[in-house]
Amino acid sequence: MNRHNVRYVVIGGIAAVLHGVPRATFDLDILIDASRDNAQRLIDALLAAGLGTAALTTADEILANEITVFKDRVRIDAQTSTPGLTFDDAWAHRISMDYQGQPFNVVSRADLIRAKRAAGRPVDLEDVRLLETRDDETG
């Protein structure tokens, strides 16, 4: 996605794992800048990565929905909004991490806690508890 200049941050379960929460997750949740150009860059990046299901949608369809699911070899949930967090805040506070030599953008721990608390599902609240426990251990 970086090669296509997609403005995104990893959120959700994978972000929790990257911040030290021991849990399983089977999809990649990303929060994207909700502009038409950015949504098109996301589609282009997914197609270049071999996710053929990206061809089944348009930038306008992504923007018309809060969540667009791309399910191919992996499941990617592209979100244009998420409870408790704006894209601009997530982007301003993002953290760059590295996986196999590729940098990617991850939501900050504080923003992740805020978003998960706002989502309010039991799994999210458990992630908040574990994230805050890790803060206490490292702080």
Where are these regions (language model features)?
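Compositionally biased terminal segments of proteins
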Residues: 1-139
